[in-house]
Amino acid sequence: MDAALALLFGQVATAVLPYVVNSIGRVPRPKRVDVKKAMGEAHQCRPVVPYRAPRPYTEGRVKALFIGINYTGSSAQLGGCVNDVMHMLQTLQRIEFPISECCILVDDRRFPNFTAMPTRENIIKYMAWLVYDVRPGDVLFFHFSGHGAETKGGRDSNEKMDQCLVPLDYDKAGAILDDDLFELMIKGLPAGVRMTAVFDCCHSASLLDLPFAFVAGRNVSSNQRHEMRMVRKDNYSRGDVVMFSGCEDSGTSADVTNTSSFGNGTVAAGGAATQAFTWALLNTTGYSYIDIFMKTREVLRQKGYKQVPQLSSSKPVDLYKQFSLFGPLTMNASLVQHLPQEYVQPWAPHPAYQQPHEATLPASVSQPHSQPVMGIPVASTSNGKSNPGVSDGGRASGEVYPPTQYPSSHPAPQQQAYYQPPQQAYYQPPQQAYYQPPQQAYYQPPQQAYYQPPQQAYYQPEPHHQPAPPPPPKKENKPARPGYPMSYCMKFSQGKPGRK
């Protein structure tokens, strides 16, 4: 009953309120991730190319993993996380971020180029794919939009509460610990690999357990001098990692019903942190790390959201250097001393990237030039201005894609293009006039007079003689009496009467 009420409230709130904070809160402590097993299965993943950027990156590969979970039909249902993935893809295309390999995990199979459902098993598998066989010069991008949660800290934890990433099947399979996220995605990165991670979920400030963070309250001024601080003395990595999170470890992130007020060209539901971060990417060309970060906070504060985005990194970033999604991080000289010496050594490019050669994709792979994701127009670059997050590495914009194969004991996954169906107009049947039957006059029956029976006189029976009546019987003359004739007698009777 409680679950049904929670589901009903979540659906009604999503449809009525301007934004919803639907937090899961605490979850049971999940089981640990088998990192070795996950890395052994990473080669099974089949990435795609989401779009073709005008200026490809030639210093290495650009791999991206997008995860959006709406938890449809559950008490934890959200409304805009799948939309966040689409919006992030569109934003990266507009700034010409040249993704060469991409996987998309969303709980909507209708999503273009859907890769897999975001279950716990799949999320772990594709996280391993993201960092599998990476080399110096490779660039990684990770985006998660969904639920974050807290769980009681373990015996080996330095915190009272650990943070968790919540997969689609968390109620059966459990969540994913922040300790495991670091072990799986960050710890093994080689020097020269750059990763940018964006978490739009609750309790997300330290989901990667990075050692350096920008520590400042909600009302910090942009006019002050800001620096990263060391927040833990372990979890170092040779890779260069920058993480943007939607809120503090104890905070929550909002799911917005209508995102049109952010000015990004979207109107559907979405995460407030994703909207603010993408707005900063699109509107702060050439700005520094601190400018991008403070703009993200300012957008949310002006719109009345209570969440405070956070910034953390694997190394002490100089916040006043120009922001980029590429290349090594420029470190703050005053904080480098806190890093062990092995993590600050310079790195050399991978031999496969030192002399890039022209490589073309097979003819069977479709990569239409400037084909936008879901029909969003590609940002124009005819004015010659550079786009944030894109670096040509000193090369002309006419460079070609990096090699698709690299000499290694572990072959890199085969590069595969984002499937684009052949351009085809809607079916038009052959032009044909409506059927015109042959012209015919209305049926005219043959002219006939009304039926005239043959003229015939009334029936006249043939005349015939009727039998003549029998002749009257003849009177037989009675014989006279013997004696005298009558006349004679009468003759004498007319005299004198006689006597009787």
Swiss-Prot record:
Biased composition (Polar residues): 379-389
Signal sequence interval, chain numbering: 1-18
Gene: MCA5
Family matches, as InterPro entries: Caspase-like_dom_sf, Metacaspase, Pept_C14_caspase
Disruption phenotype: RNAi-mediated knockdown causes no defect in the growth of the bloodstream stage form. Knockout has no defect in the growth of the procyclic form. Simultaneous RNAi-mediated knockdown of MCA2, MCA3 and MCA5 in the bloodstream stage form causes a growth arrest resulting from a block prior to cytokinesis; DNA replication and mitosis are normal. Has no effect on VSG protein recycling. Triple knockout of MCA2, MCA3 and MCA5 in the bloodstream form causes an initial slower growth rate in vitro which reaches wild-type levels after several weeks of culture.
Active-site residues, record numbering mapped to chain: H147, C202
Function per UniProt: Cysteine protease that cleaves specifically after arginine or lysine residues.
EC number assigned by the record: 3.4.22.-
Residues reported to bind Ca(2+): D162, D178, D179, D209
Protein name per the record: Metacaspase-5
Location of this chain's protein in the cell: Recycling endosome
Similarity field: Belongs to the peptidase C14B family.
Domain of life assignment: Eukaryota
Renumbered residue ranges of the record's region Important for catalytic activity: 19-63
Biological process terms in GO annotation: proteolysis
Low complexity bias: start-end ranges: 444-461
Region (Disordered): 358-419, 444-500
Enzyme class: hydrolase
GO-annotated molecular function: cysteine-type endopeptidase activity; metal ion binding
Keywords: Calcium, Endosome, Glycoprotein, Hydrolase, Metal-binding, Protease, Signal, Thiol protease
Glycosylation sites: N70, N113, N219, N235, N258, N264, N283, N332
Transport as UniProt keyword: no
GO CC entries: recycling endosome
Organism: Trypanosoma brucei brucei
